[in-house]
Design a protein with these regions (language model features):
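Post-transcriptional modification and biogenesis factors for structured RNAs
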Residues: 1-165
C-alpha cells in the first residue's frame, strides 16, 4: 500500500485547489491544506473545479505550517520549488511521500527550503519564465511519483462506450 500526500501551503486561488482536489481524488492521494487559505472552502469556483468528487477526497486542514509538521512528523517530504537544485523526476519517492507546494504568488518560505535543500525539487522549465501553474505542477509531480510506483490501484485501460478494443 502506497501513501501519497499533497500539501498546499496557503493556496490563494480556489480554481487551482479545486483542480488539485480532483487530481487527488482520481489518484487516491491525500490532500493537506495549510491555512490561511485565500478563499472560503464553500467558494463556488473551488467546488466547480473539483466537480462531484468531493466525497471521494481525503482532505485535512492545518492552522499553520508548524501545525502540519507537528501532526505529520514521520513523512518523507519533497519541496517543489522553482528554486530547487534537483530535478523532480530524478528523486526517489518512498512510501508516505509528501509533495509540498507553496503559494501561487510566493512559493514556499526560503528558510524552509534552505533547511531542506536536499529534498527541494524543481520541474524543469525555461529560465526566463517565472513558473508553471500550481495545479499543473501538482499533476506533473503526482503522476511522476505514481509512475515510479507503477500506478498502484489505478486503472491502466479505458473502455469505449460503443465499441470493444
Amino acid at each position: 500500500m502506497h501513501n501519497l500526500n499533497i500539501v498546499l501551503v496557503e493556496p490563494q486561488i480556489p480554481q487551482n485547489t479545486g483542480n488539485i482536489s480532483r487530481t487527488c481524488a482520481v489518484t487516491g492521494a491525500k490532500l493537506h491544506l495549510v491555512k490561511p487559505l485565500g478563499f472560503e472552502i464553500s467558494d463556488k469556483h473551488l467546488k466547480r473545479a473539483g466537480l462531484d468528487y468531493w466525497d471521494k477526497l481525503d482532505i485535512s486542514y492545518y492552522d499553520s505550517l508548524d501545525d502540519f509538521f507537528e501532526k505529520n512528523p514521520d513523512g518523507n517530504f519533497f519541496y517543489f520549488t522553482t528554486k530547487g537544485k534537483n530535478v523532480h523526476s530524478e528523486a526517489d519517492y518512498p512510501d508516505n511521500s509528501y509533495l509540498v507546494f507553496g503559494r501561487e504568488d510566493a512559493g514556499l518560505p526560503e528558510d524552509l527550503l534552505y533547511r531542506n535543500s536536499g529534498n527541494c525539487v524543481r520541474i524543469p522549465m525555461r529560465n526566463e519564465l517565472r513558473s508553471l501553474n500550481l495545479s499543473n505542477s501538482v499533476a506533473i509531480a503526482v503522476y511522476e511519483v505514481l509512475r515510479q510506483w507503477d500506478y498502484p490501484d489505478l486503472a491502466r485501460e479505458g473502455k469505449l462506450t460503443k465499441y470493444k478494443w
